[in-house]
Amino acid sequence: MSSPTSKNVSETNGNKPKKSAKTSSNTKGGSMDTRAELADLIKKKAETSEQLANLERQIYAFEGSYLEDTQLCGNIIRGWERYLTSNKATNSKADKRNRKFKEAERLFSKSSITSMAICNPERASESDSITNEDSSDNQISINQNTTTAHDGTTTIKSTPKDEKDSPSHRNEGSVVSGMVSGSTNSGGNKDLLGTPTSNTKSKLSTNSSATAKKSGHINKKIRHR
């Protein structure tokens, strides 16, 4: 006869695979639920974005009609001065011309990035292209500055410290300095030799006057004889 403990062990062993099957089914059901929730959230996001786009279009159109209707008499953006100065008996064609407004006067539409992208996709793309061109130009100028700076550093660092400290480099420097000083001294001596001083000029003038006086005395003696 089998003991009751062996029966309990066999029963527990028989029930184990059933539990694993239940857990696997629960995990599958949970993954399916999360996918369904994610799909619902994506669908709701698309619906809300579409509603927001429609609302932005309505605001854009209403703002344009408001600016056109109040361009002659004044509005909350341009003020109310035109209401007092405007001529009410105007021509219909001139009225239509004057009703045109500038896009810069749009205040509510420009306050939202989504409205600018939805209502004016071409202008949004143009602004993006302009910003990209500006960034590329700035990058090119930065690269040019870095290359010139690198060239300057290479020219400055052409003679390293080891070569400057070497005795050959010192001898070359002393020879060059001696040649420069010698050339300056020789130039100074040439200038001294080439240009007479004031003392030599005075001596020459006195000698010439003395010789002139002697020649005058000799001529007088000859005539007297």
From Swiss-Prot:
The keyword Transcription regulation applies. It holds the Pfam family NuA4. It comes from the Eukaryota. One of its GO terms (molecular function) is acetyltransferase activator activity. Residues 1-34, 120-225 are annotated as: Disordered. GO terms for cellular component: MOZ/MORF histone acetyltransferase complex; NuA4 histone acetyltransferase complex; nucleus. Residues 30-65 form a coiled coil. The keyword Transport does not apply. It is found in: Nucleus. Residues 159-172 have a biased composition (Basic and acidic residues). Keywords: Chromatin regulator, Coiled coil, Nucleus, Transcription, Transcription regulation. Its main location: nucleus. Residues 214-225 have a biased composition (Basic residues). Residues 173-189, 197-213 have a biased composition (Low complexity). GO terms for biological process: chromatin organization. Transmembrane segments: none annotated. Residues 1-15, 127-158 have a biased composition (Polar residues). Component of the Enok complex which has a histone H3 acetyltransferase activity. Might be involved in transcriptional activation of selected genes. Component of the Enok complex composed of at least Br140, enok, Eaf6 and Ing5. Belongs to the EAF6 family. This is Chromatin modification-related protein MEAF6. The lineage of its organism: Eukaryota, Metazoa, Ecdysozoa, Arthropoda, Hexapoda.
